[in-house]
Structures are given as structure tokens and as C-alpha cells.
Amino acid sequence: MKKLIWLFVFAFMPLVIFSQRNADYGVFGGVASYFGDINTNKILYSPRPAAGVFYRYNLHQRHSLRANLFAGGLSANDADFNNSFQQNRAASFSGMVAEMVLQFEFNFFPYSTDGKKWNSTPYFAGGIGGAFIDTKEVAVIPVIPFSFGFKINIKRNIGLEAEYGFRKTFYDNFDGLESYPYAWTHNNDWYTFTGICVTWKFYKLAGCPAYNDVDSKRKR
């Protein structure tokens, strides 16, 4: 886990230092939930508190790179489901997940937190990452993160976002159970993060003509 953290820091330190003008910083608050052999189909099942921080480098008003550090609780119990198989199995677990992921983010409309107030757009993101799992066992696993949401610029340099993110893992032991043959998750466990993000810029530097090209055309 420590090696992943240091790799994360060194990979993005140059962007943080030299790219302030096009950078957003954010905090996330919401819930985490689990899909797997116990919960095969319920969205937002057994939600547990989750929080995180992220750094976004805006390549363009439609394209960004985003680095997340999120963590949240996970739990599930067969007693929550009304079928005889799960009632007899009586499996359960609780624990946590902490992740570091890099995503490419696409805005459906041009968006910037240093431009017009109430600028808004839906967005989608996908990428790669790793997660530290502590449930039935402790493990570090690769994940493929996907997210979609809606963002709005509520004040100059400040944005608000609502996001649902789901993580495909290559791991089947969140719950300590052998694969359930009919699970839609294809025998690997998944987890999700759902919540609200607040983003901001610490300060504003001189604008970049290439970055502002789309916004200037819209104002003509």
C-alpha cells in the first residue's frame, strides 16, 4: 500500500506544481456499497460512509485527467435477502476499501470553474487504479473505475458535482464466499462510490489562449 501511495505522489507532483492554472482540487463525501455473491443486484445496498480527495488537471474544457484517493466502508448480510439459499447460508462481512485511481474525464459540454457562473455539464470518466481491501482478508488489487455525474459552477472558481462511480475488480473474496454461479457480476466482486464533490481553485493565474479557445468562441 505504501508503494502505491508513493507512486501516486511522484506521478502527479509535477502536475500539481506546474499546472495550477488548469487544476481543480476537490473533496468527496457520500457512501460506498458492494456487489458480489451476497448482493447480486441491489443498487446502493447497505450504504456505508465514504470520503475522499482528488486532483483534476484540465487538458481542455471537455477533457481532464483526474487522480482520486477515496475510502469507504463495505458490508453485506445474507439475512437482508428473502431467498431460502441465502437465509440458510447466513454469510456476512464488514470492512473497508481505500483506492487510488487515475481517470480520463469527458465533459459533454465545455466546462470551466473560472469562467461563466452556472456553467454546467454531465460527464463520464474511466481509467485504471488500485485498491486496498480489508474485509474477509487483506489484499491490494487492481480495479477499473468508471464514473458518471453532473457538475455545475456555482461560484467563480467553485464547482459542485453529483457522482456515481462503480469499480470492476479482479477479486472474488470481499465476502469470503466461493463464486455464486448466477451472479450478474461474472463471479468477481464490485464496489461503488456515490456522493457529492466540491471543487475549487486556490488562485487564478493568467489565462492560456489554447485552453480558453472554446469559451471565447461561445461568447462571440
Listing of model-derived features with the role each one plays in the protein:
Residues 19-56, 199-205, 220:
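Short glycine/proline- and aromatic-enriched beta-strand/turn motifs that initiate or cap beta-hairpins
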Residues 23, 62-65, 112, 156-160, ...:
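Repeated loop/turn-to-beta-strand initiation elements of outer-membrane beta-barrel proteins
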Residues 27-31, 53-57, 102-106, 126-130, ...:
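Residues on the lipid-exposed face of transmembrane beta-strands in outer-membrane beta-barrel proteins
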Residues 37-42, 78-84, 115-117, 135-140, ...:
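Outer-membrane beta-barrel translocator domains and adjoining extracellular loop/strand segments
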Residues 61-136, 200-202:
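Gram-negative (and chloroplast) outer-membrane scaffold detector with strong preference
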Residues 78-79, 154-220:
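Predominantly the C-terminal beta-signal and adjacent terminal strand-loop region
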